[in-house]
Amino acid sequence: MDKIIIKNARENNLKNVSIEIPKNKLVVMTGVSGSGKSSLAFDTIYAEGQRRYVESLSSYARQFLGSTSKPDVDSIEGLSPSISIDQKTTNKNPRSTVATVTEIYDYLRLLFARVGVPYCPTHHIPIKSQSIEEMTNRVLELEEGTKIMVMSPVVKGEKGTHADTLSKLIKEGYVRVKVDNVIKDLNDEIVLEKNKKHDIYVVVDRLVVKDGIRGRLFSSLETACNLSHGKVIIDKLDGEDIVLSEKYACPYCDYSLDELEPRIFSFNAPYGACSCCKGLGVQYKLDLDLIIPDRNKSINEGGISTINVDESSNIIYTELNAVSKKYDIDLDAKIKDIPKEKLDIILYGSKEKLEFNYVSKNGNTRTNYDYFEGIITNLERRYIETKSSWIREWIEHYMNEIECPVCHGARLNSNVLSVLVGNKNIYQVTELSILELKDFINSLKLSKEQEEISLIIIKEINSRVDFLINVGLDYLTLNRSAGTLSGGESQRIRLATQIGSRLTGVLYVLDEPSIGLHQRDNQRLINSLLEMRDLGNSLIVVEHDTDTMLAADYLVDIGPGAGDNGGRVIACGTPEEVMANKNSLTGKYLTGELKIDIPEKRRRGNKKFLEIKGAKENNLKNVNVKIPLGTFTCVTGVSGSGKSSLINEVLYKALAVSVYGSKVKPGKCKEIKGLENVDKVIQITQSPIGRTPRSNPATYVGVFDDIRDIFANTKEAKIRGYDKGRFSFNVKGGRCEACWGDGVKKIEMHFLPDVYVPCEVCNGTRYNSDTLEIKFKDKNIYEVLNMRVDEAMEFFSNHPKVLNKLQVLHDVGLGYVTLGQIAPTLSGGEAARVKLAKELQKKPTGKSVFILDEPTTGLHTDDIKKLLVILERIVDNGDTVIVIEHNLDVIKVADYIIDLGPEGGNKLGGNIVCTGTPEEVSKVSGSYTGQFLKKILDTK
């Protein structure tokens, strides 16, 4: 069958969608946010393919994977084995790096195990084991006529008179020894100081290098090795000594390594990992400045921040009062005035037992005698022992990541780091970018034997490197943590890995692979997709990028709107056929009938600036730049050019310190002028709004508090005495205790992404049955959380407080998202827009700076148009918007552009290419952004 036939798909908002999708083609699905693209591509087509795969496995295998429900669809025919490459499965495991997820590290481990040369870390000489035959050949390579002594080091750096050793040598018939660099006759009396270290080398033979000595030399070397457990020193009377060893050890200090195996180069295995950080390269330490942010406060005023938010704070205050009484500590005094030795008791615990009198809620008193654990000691213990990801995440707010003091971030132990290939150890190789690795691997100077051994290994590394370069990731360093990659970067890494696997007959479902990619690199990505297609695979790509849509063999436009207004196939066919369809919103944007207009004039700002001088963070090359306040500024450049380093690391962190007194460490720069002109800074990134099911859009923007108030004020709730806390899933009372109000249970898969399964007690509702009996307008709290934002706006139309907060979520294009959608399932773009919605509720100050990192992620051109209206509104209120962006529809409407590059990575990135209005940048021939802008502005 040459097509996938779908009949009556009803998953989520799909309206009985029936469609035939050609196989072995590049198929692009597009439409506004929430129209149903992902519901069709991922929740229907991919989910059914995955379900069928699981069903085909043995019952033994299925017990580990669990059952997957069938998508709501009548039938799907012609389905191939399916693989999903989306943005939501980024591996946050700190042990995952670019090198490990691309499998390049596996081949590097193999390369180092097979051709690596171990060096003694003390004497910096290669460690080699040599047979007597090899030693003989080595000596005979010396210039003819060279006078040598074959010596055996029987004593090396040892204290004592060594009388027994010398006596034994005389009995064995030896005549001369070299004692502390002086040749002595054994027949003479040799007196050595007892408390000094000595070296004693036995002179086994004296020779002149010439033809005919091989037999004698071989015999002498063998004798020398037997005397000193495999070590020989060849003393060239007129030159440096040659040290030879029969063992795999340093001949000077006996430093030795086990046989080189790939496993010892893994930081995920105990054989190679640094024993201090267990292969993480970093340690997490509680930061006292984060625990006590303001030492002018007293403990009773909340000076210790962890006590204020900890559910067990009443217990701790009981214990603190006992500590205060015992050690005469004034809990109302400013923390800075408490003597260090007394504050240490509060922080690190007591050395003697105290009397604690605990009072329960019903008034009962319980007395206990125990040590006071201490605030910091308590947090450290709980961080190690807890199985709750929520508790661990909360404690991490008070921790700092510091470089491991032993391996200094290398993750591996010193033994492993002493093995070199091309004068680099394996950690130094992982510090290279993908492009630099290609140069390094292909310029290695290897012996003929090493070349033969490494030929296939280097071929495999080159293959993976080429695929990564082709998807625009040449700037990434191999040791970059996988958790720091953007959704687009991690997806393109997985895409490169799949291309490298050379599978055929597979259905790939991708989610916006062009995210984070500069227009310059778009064609390379499209070529990679076409290459996968040409291998005999089918590709379904959810995408908004114009170039990708025009390159598609088949285009599917879903809409017309979001949520209930979407879920229909509006147009399908070749890109030309979709453009000819008058009902297609996408088609109208592709033809230019609809477009985002270029403003008639650009704002000049309020004549105030943020001026960054001498920025050197990551790959930034002493960057100097001025950002006009009161404008919409776009920071552009190819991937890896330094945009995030300049804006997120240098500027944002400096503003956070200046405005809020934050404890973060700003990126390296000489100075930043104009900080006094900013009274508020808001950073909107694609990082999750939370990492647990407790976080959702409703709680994040604060509307859930108002909704709980409404439920608490219902007649039935008042009769039962329920307050708003009853409707919280974060505290005991109304929540389901089996899942702690999560509605799901997390199953840690260790080597796979964690899996969330519905709680079998509450069936995913989060609440107990008593709480769910309380209804407002015939809906319980769970049913309200399941409403989409647009539905909830109608439901709460008579509650202005709720409506206003929901309106902002709608305005940023999230009307289709459910109020209770758990944070881990939100895409990076959705998470960013939830954060923006929260900030838009607040009144403008005229001195605020909004920093957004790729806010157009996941947005159709029509959604971008709406987002730009909001950003323009912020700037019109006098505030400043700084956006890191690749999308030309955003760049062309900016007031000011800062273009970095010219390329990505350490060598060619990190410079200011040009600055100015879009018109000014478009005239700079050396700017890739300018070249693409010119095409757009010329057609204005």
Per-segment meaning from a language model:
Residues 1-940:
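Conserved phosphate-binding elements of NTP-dependent enzyme cores
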